[in-house]
Amino acid sequence: MESTSPHQGSFYKSNLCSPDSPKDTVPKQPMSATLRERLRKTRRSFNAAFSVAKRLKVDCEENESSSDCPNNNLPPHEDSEPNATKIEVDLVSEGDICRLDSRTSSEASSPVRCKDHKQLLQEKKLLLKKLEEQEDTLRRLKMVKLYRAKNNLSELQSLIEKWRKSSQLSLYELQAALIAENNKVTLSQLIESYGLDENLLHYNRTEEDFQDQ
């Protein structure tokens, strides 16, 4: 069996656990001012009270070193913060003005709309009333037409004349019968007692006789 010396063991440990080996270490690169500015502006946009679109202002291009920037010694927020705040205030102010204008215009037009709505309701009521009147008139005309179709006016006139003559004869006979019984009764008294219409009977009260006779 081969024996290992203390120097060889320490050599193996140094090769396995040494932090200075080129495989385990990655050289750290310093963060540029441009990248820091981007991170700061991005963080401020997330924490802002209003979400507004901001344009990131970069003082130095990414391909240039920090020594080429003229304002590298100044704090990064002094150059861009006033502009960003101004843009945000301007955008919020314009939004408030637009909302105020739209609200004012809607409130101004609401009385006009209400007036137009009332006028339309009144016109609707008038049209419905006229429509009902026309429908009622049409219904009456249809009834008259139906009545005339079922009843012949000439036939009705002949029936009325027959009724008048028969009524007159009946009254004459009744008056003669009552006189025979020593009851003197006039035709006017008989017509009134039976509730007959003098105009239909063609009775003349002055002469106390029928006009057709």
Swiss-Prot record:
Residue runs in coiled coils: 112-169
Alphabetized InterPro entries for the sequence: SFR1 (IPR042429), SFR1/Mei5 (IPR018468)
Main location per the UniProt record: nucleus
Pfam families referenced in this protein's UniProt entry, alphabetically: Mei5 (PF10376)
GO cellular component: nucleus; Swi5-Sfr1 complex
Superkingdom in the source lineage: Eukaryota
Keyword Transcription regulation: yes
Positions of the UniProt region annotated as Disordered: 1-40, 59-82
Record GO biological process: double-strand break repair via homologous recombination; positive regulation of DNA-templated transcription
Keyword terms of this UniProt record: Coiled coil, DNA damage, DNA repair, Nucleus, Transcription, Transcription regulation
UniProt keyword annotation of DNA repair present: yes
Stretches with biased composition (Polar residues): 1-18
A GO term, aspect molecular function: transcription coactivator activity
Compartments reported by the entry: Nucleus
Primary role: Component of the swi5-sfr1 complex, a complex required for double-strand break repair via homologous recombination.
Subunit structure: Component of the swi5-sfr1 complex.
Recorded family membership: Belongs to the SFR1/MEI5 family.
Protein name in UniProt: Swi5-dependent recombination DNA repair protein 1 homolog
Protein's organism: Xenopus laevis
Taxonomic lineage: Eukaryota, Metazoa, Chordata, Craniata, Vertebrata
Gene name in the database record: sfr1
